[in-house]
Amino acid sequence: MKIIVGIDLGTTNSEISCLRTEGRPEVIPVEGETIMPSCVGIDHEGRLMVGRTAKNQMVANPEQTILSIKRRMGEKITLPLGDKAFSPEEISSFILGKLKSAAETYLGQKVEKAVITVPAYFDDAQRQATREAGILAGLDVVRIINEPTAAALAYEAGREEKQRILIYDLGGGTFDASLVEMENGIVEVRSSHGDTHLGGDDFDRLLSDHVALPFKKKYGIDLKSDLKAANRLWVAVEKAKRTLSDRPFATIREEFIVGDRHLDVEISREEYEEMIRPLLRKTMIAVHSCLKDAMFLPKAIDKIILVGGSTRTPLVARMLEDDMGIEPHHEINPDLIVAMGAAIQGAAMSGAKTKAILVDITPYTFGTRAIGEYQGRMTSDVYVPVIKRNSALPVGKEELFYTNYDNQQDILVEIFQGDEPLASENIFIGNFWIKGLSKAKAGNLILLNLELDVNGILKVTAKEKATGLARTVTMDTANKGTGTNLEEKRSNI
């Protein structure tokens, strides 16, 4: 039986895990470390570096080093590296490729399939980009699961008692809150909320600003305007942040950071926590939205699990305990728990006996644009939800629509993501035409079917009821991820 590995493709760090027996998953080391920096670079001789070596060269060669690429997933951009330019999917594929290679060495066999985790609040484009990165790395991505869900699998696998668990997942670049119900090995996600641009990187930025401002006032030099100085500051701040998780004070000391100027600053944990408190309040708003969607009060929660390296900041646990009245749990390393859960899901899909079954949800509503009434007036911008957020996956829903005028033969189907009453206020996902409808009077019946699979990938079918004429499109593959584009990206790599 071939192993299906579990991968946590993170903003700051990435991990890979597998389950070879019915015991606990094992985290596979990469160059001797269980945590690999999600960093890609090119050295001065043009050689590709991934992981720790790439991060180590960041200060000396910042122009040729890329960090936090996860925050750009789903964007149609390219980033220069060496004498080429790469998409976020291509950069991520280098990270996945390094993890794959390490696993093959460790296991002594080919690794061809993987379960990859994403933030619960990743949209369709970001999920599709993650899948494409896996393909470019030579992996068959058999499942994409949400990070909080993976954490629940790892933490609660095999426990029989019924529990309601809040997963608080604060990573390097993203935040998710998910409410999970578990009973008799069934892991069912009830609701999710989050922010795909809130995490430890934002804490680093606040800390960098706090340190750089006094230096600028004293010397008239903006450390953040000098690329090498800015990267030295970033590395020093990241180290200080980790220190403040365990100690009340941290010192940032960088000699000759610019010319003959030195940086020497002491920061207290109290100062740092006051800086990040407004961002953590935003996470608590998401937590309460998550509870509201599931129609639970805080007292209904049995356990809180902390996930992600940024939860090591003591203020996180204090805020949660003060607000929810429950002391959070972090018995399993918060950096590793997601990869371990993905490995459990991978083992289940490979046919191995596992003690948990996953029932995941979509955190988003998907729908279409139609003509209708809004605030007492007719408009062609009414949003009609088809799949509601927090629906269990996989899910398929069908709604009935009508042609607008006699002999209408073409219809533009537009798909949006969101919950606002007007389509234009939601996120546009994609569109397509269905042409050649029969010449009929206005009111010709059109069936619109939306299907969302377990990976959160959306398939849309529009069909004329009278004739059966239909067109089906998998959203996000019309413009990207096609075989031709993948081959172009493979050749670029």
Regions found by a protein language model. Name each.
Residues 1-75, 79-85, 94, 101-493:
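Oxyanion-binding/catalytic loops of NTP- or PPi-dependent enzymes
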